[in-house]
């Protein structure tokens, strides 16, 4: 099975996303995180299907999941998730503070 690793900031992003959505719908929050986990496994098996995001950093790729975007980099036998952000946010500012 392909590996999916998460940087601490990605873990924090997921907690923030779940907490925000769960205020209105804990079930909806659970479903979104399940979908992110499923897509992460797909990306780990085929890491180059995401869009190259060289403007954010070397080897960074992105993949949309609903209103969110998963940012990751391919690693040996999988991916490492860097961030999970809402698509309406200023992505470049968050990567280059």
Listing of model-derived features with the role each one plays in the protein:
Residues 68, 73-97:
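Enriched for short, Lys/Arg-rich terminal
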Residues 3-56, 60:
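Basic, Lys/Arg-enriched alpha-helical interface segments
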Residues 1-2, 97:
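Absolute protein N-terminus
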Residues 48-78:
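Basic/aromatic recognition patch in beta-strand/loop cores that engages polyanionic ligands
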Residues 8-11, 58, 66, 88-94:
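Intrinsically disordered, low-complexity segments enriched in polar/charged small residues
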Residues 23-26, 62, 82, 91:
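Short, low-complexity, polar/charged sequence segments that are solvent-exposed and flexible
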């Amino acid at each position: 099975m392909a590996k999916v690793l998460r940087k601490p900031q990605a873990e924090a992003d997921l907690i923030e996303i779940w907490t925000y959505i769960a205020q209105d719908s804990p079930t909806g929050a659970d479903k979104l995180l399940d979908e992110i986990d499923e897509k992460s496994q797909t990306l780990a098996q085929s890491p180059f299907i995401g869009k190259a995001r060289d403007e954010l950093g070397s080897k960074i790729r992105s993949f949309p999941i609903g209103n969110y975007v998963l940012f990751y980099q391919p690693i040996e036998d999988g991916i490492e998730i860097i961030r999970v952000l809402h698509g309406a946010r200023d992505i470049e500012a968050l990567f280059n503070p």
